[in-house]
């Protein structure tokens, strides 16, 4: 009975290993030789295979391991495509590809991406995070908010009545004759001077007009008043 239980247990274990290794498609692949068996994530295989198209080495393992640009591209792909759980396994797979060659230039720590575009993008992102993290006292939001403030001046000018382009909008447009040579300003100045000259002309000319405002005017008024009083008294006596 013990032998039968042991055989059945081994059969179940073999079925489980076979199903996990071949039937179930996952993010891990089984790679190994006659004595060792290792699991590697799909991102490691994808980065190693797809990056070959950017080089001239094709399938030459010796050429791939000696190409520094290819190795940097593989590391950048692993750094961006593999998550934290699979990053160590993907890095181990990349290092293991060149263990049998004379050009073992892979290291345990991946280098920082040396491309200017990636470094510039990281710097801009860090600067933007600091800018917007410290508040909106300066930077792009404050600069863009200036446009509504400037445009608010236009409705303010027309508050309190209809739109008026200038303070002198109610004054009619001056008439310019075709035969006129001088400007309207010169004409108005000439008219004003003639008006001002009438006062001294009337005061300096010899005229008996000041005598009209003497006692003669009061005498005539008194005579008229006396006549009216006598007429009223006569009518009253008759009645």
Curated annotation (Swiss-Prot):
Stated induction or repression of this protein's expression:
Induced during infection of poplar leaves, with highest expression observed four days post inoculation.
Sequence ranges of Polar residues compositional bias: 187-199
Its predominant location is: membrane
Where on the tree of life does the source sit, at the highest rank?
Eukaryota
Which function does this protein serve? Appears to function during host infection, and may play a role in suppressing the host immune response.
Question: What keywords does the record list, in alphabetical order?
Answer: Cell membrane, Disulfide bond, Glycoprotein, GPI-anchor, Heme, Host cell membrane, Host membrane, Host nucleus, Iron, Lipoprotein, Membrane, Metal-binding, Secreted, Signal, Virulence
Free-text comment about domains: The CFEM domain is involved in heme-binding and contains 8 cysteines and is found in proteins from several pathogenic fungi, including both human and plant pathogens. The CFEM domain adopts a novel helical-basket fold that consists of six alpha-helices, and is uniquely stabilized by four disulfide bonds formed by its 8 signature cysteines.
Q: What's one GO-annotated cellular component?
A: host cell nucleus
- Any one Pfam family here would be CFEM
Q: Which family does it belong to?
A: Belongs to the RBT5 family.
Chain residue ranges for the region called Disordered: 187-216
Q: Which GO terms describe its molecular function?
A: metal ion binding
Q: Which cysteines are joined by disulfide bonds?
A: 43-82, 47-77, 57-63, 65-98
Q: Which residues bind heme?
A: 60
Known glycosylation sites: 216
What positions belong to the pro-peptide in this record? 216-239
Q: Which gene encodes it?
A: CFEM9
Q: Where is the lipid attached (GPI-anchor amidated glycine)?
A: 215
UniProt subcellular location: Cell membrane; Secreted; Host nucleus; Host cell membrane
Q: What is this protein called?
A: Secreted effector CFEM9
How does the record say this protein sits in the membrane? Lipid-anchor; GPI-anchor
Q: Which GO terms describe its biological process?
A: biological process involved in interaction with host
Which segment of the chain is annotated as a signal peptide? 1-18
